[in-house]
Amino acid sequence: MGRFCTSTIILLVLVFAATVAYQPTALAQDYNKQNLEGVDFSGQDLTNDSFTKANLTNSNLSHSTLEGVSLFGANLEGANLEGADLTYATLDLANFKNANLTNAILEGAFGFSARFPGAIIDGADFTDVLLRPETQEELCSVAKGTNPITGRDTRETLFCY
């Protein structure tokens, strides 16, 4: 009987320790179609979150990790994305009118039908971003600078010649 109690207590302690030690990974957040106008997401890890068709007008996403995020059809007019990491993000049909993308990393993002009128892209890295030819021309007309993280020249990442 004593051996049974000792074994049971040890088992309970191990189960409790395993439960306390287990840290579940964060699940991606769903912000689809939400009105997030002016919301401050600066410096946050938003990896794989979804902002499909969300209103992010004048929101602050500066220095945020947005890797793999869906911004499909989102309105980012006037948003601050300075220093944001948008690697492999879905940007198709997103509106970046007058957005600040200074030093942002957009490597591998899909943005074929994204719009960038009046966007500030100084130092932004567009390596392997799929864009429409007319969007590429528009961005090349204002492209300048070098991304401080990747060391890549904005004009070179856009193939501006």
Which role does the model predict for each range below?
Residues 2-8, 14-161:
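Tandem repeat scaffolds
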